[in-house]
């Protein structure tokens, strides 16, 4: 068997085992050194794949796909700086425990650190952000094929195990590496002949949910039963079963629940949005739970964590599915690594439901706060960043998805969304490292993984940051509606103290831009609109939801007016809360 045959077979075996293990979606970027892997993936009858001229965009697309499916997409790239472009997406995936697999083709060992063209030190490039790094040997009949297959088995296991995240496999190839059908009767294949004749992986890892032990459940039930005023927080929950179980627990025991936007429960109409209550500084002073039970990951807003820090409750319990460290305030008294759904189900019936008087604020407060927000959404009023969030939240359904960019879009949706859903639905956001890079690519991957229409809300700077990702949309096969909140710059900085530094604020922080969103959409063949009123905006959103094509809706705003609207509305809600708390 010659080198071309060995290399072709080597690559086909890698791709075959990945497909058998359920990692059958490939994000491929063109390149010469990765030819064997690309051809093997493209020709596999059960593999799905998409091409990405930009590896950075590919990395974020794979991240979004993982968020939607909890399965790793496989990234394939050539040698050199190509793999380095995955770095931002790898950081986000690692920080937020999202599975990802990277196959980077490389030059052979003898060319490393010799000045050879397109050759860098690729192995270990992601440092501590990778769950496992491995360098396969150059394809050779001296290498047992079973060792190659089991390396792939371990890679998938590491990416999807108890602490999911990115895994990097470096795959060096010597020339020539053009594909050539190998001799399948070669003696080199004898040790894997049974594997070839089946469709099952050589070695499967049977991972199981982190099951709570009896002692954990017993301790938790006792703590909650003896608590005078328990309080629940739902942080980031990665699947619908966790969201359903946590929501059911709060409802059955009538325990007040702070549902973060990333929990999937923020838009559940059976829970009042406590984000509004936390706008009043008096609220955490008057409402003092003795037990806080936090399910899942971190929160979008700072106020709840600040309140817990001030409360210093006797019991501060965190239930999280992974072994990553969590708790920047260092005030957790009990940390349990287990499935949030299993814990929540095991706590049902642990005490009699709390009386209605134990809720943080009475129902009329939330109704009046809702009325204040809804004034911003009157049909003939100009569409604003607040009304856009409110309207989008009222239109999304469990049959669709929602993705939020960092900076103001995620904060506005968390605070001003309208609870209108009857059950949890998928909400995506990159809150591991909270960057604004790669948002369109991530949302596109999220839509691909969900196989459902998705609405993305994004600011103009984040939109421009990932502009080339618009090239992915015409062939996405799933409608993605991008709502661009265009306030001519970085709107969030207008809320920060640096806004008073007049000599540097506009040029160094707000960074105003004058690019045409419409022209960008036209360049990539995407329909766009710019509604002026809330009525027009809602009509555009409904039209986008009924379409099978991707679209862009531009909400043109003014940063100064936006700050004024936010502060006016916030002061009204704060005053409203204070009036109820003083009674």
From Swiss-Prot:
Disulfide bonds: none annotated. CDD domains: TPP_PYR_MenD, TPP_SHCHC_synthase. GO terms for molecular function: 2-succinyl-5-enolpyruvyl-6-hydroxy-3-cyclohexene-1-carboxylic-acid synthase activity; magnesium ion binding; manganese ion binding; thiamine pyrophosphate binding. The keyword Manganese applies. It is an enzyme of class 2 (transferase). Its cofactor is Mg(2+); Mn(2+); thiamine diphosphate. InterPro entries: DHS-like_NAD/FAD-binding_dom, MenaQ_synth_MenD, MenD_middle, THDP-binding, Thiamin_PyroP_enz_TPP-bd_dom, TPP_enzyme_TPP-bd. Keywords: Magnesium, Manganese, Menaquinone biosynthesis, Metal-binding, Thiamine pyrophosphate, Transferase. Pathway: Quinol/quinone metabolism; 1,4-dihydroxy-2-naphthoate biosynthesis; 1,4-dihydroxy-2-naphthoate from chorismate: step 2/7; Quinol/quinone metabolism; menaquinone biosynthesis. Pfam families: TPP_enzyme_C, TPP_enzyme_M_2, TPP_enzyme_N. Binds 1 thiamine pyrophosphate per subunit. One of its GO terms (biological process) is menaquinone biosynthetic process. It catalyses: isochorismate + 2-oxoglutarate + H(+) = 5-enolpyruvoyl-6-hydroxy-2-succinyl-cyclohex-3-ene-1-carboxylate + CO2. Its EC number is 2.2.1.9. Homodimer. Belongs to the TPP enzyme family. MenD subfamily. Catalyzes the thiamine diphosphate-dependent decarboxylation of 2-oxoglutarate and the subsequent addition of the resulting succinic semialdehyde-thiamine pyrophosphate anion to isochorismate to yield 2-succinyl-5-enolpyruvyl-6-hydroxy-3-cyclohexene-1-carboxylate (SEPHCHC). This is 2-succinyl-5-enolpyruvyl-6-hydroxy-3-cyclohexene-1-carboxylate synthase. It comes from Chlorobium limicola (strain DSM 245 / NBRC 103803 / 6330). The gene is menD.
